[in-house]
């Protein structure tokens, strides 16, 4: 499965304490689209959060997620590459 498109929707945070940097849409093989991946700045660096929902008991469950670490790294790399390309001056890449 190939990543054929990555679209970044940056979040302009006026509140510097906000950790959300962007929402991402990824297209696979020009036939499957995954919306609402989030780019988050944490204490240890930047990482992605897969789309999730809150259950009735308050837990968050991923709707979709990579099955193995190698695909997660491919996905994260493609997202960060596009993010940096769109915003080179204001992004210090420290991956988690």
Swiss-Prot record:
Pfam family, one: SpoVG
Keyword Cell division on entry: yes
Top-rank taxon: Bacteria
Keyword Repeat: no
GO biological process, one term: sporulation resulting in formation of a cellular spore
Keywords: Cell cycle, Cell division, Septation
Cystines in this chain: none
SUPFAM superfamilies in the record: SpoVG-like
Family: Belongs to the SpoVG family.
Function field: Could be involved in septation.
Protein name: Putative septation protein SpoVG
């Amino acid at each position: 499965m190939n990543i054929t498109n990555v679209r970044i929707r940056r979040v302009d945070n006026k509140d510097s304490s906000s950790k959300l940097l962007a929402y991402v849409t990824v297209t696979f093989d020009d036939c499957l689209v995954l919306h609402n991946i989030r780019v988050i700045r944490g204490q240890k660096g930047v990482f992605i959060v897969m789309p999730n929902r809150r259950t009735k008991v308050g837990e968050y469950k991923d709707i979709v997620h990579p099955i193995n670490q190698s695909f997660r790294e491919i996905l994260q790399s493609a997202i960060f590459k596009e993010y940096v390309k769109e915003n080179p001056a204001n992004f210090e890449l420290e991956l988690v």
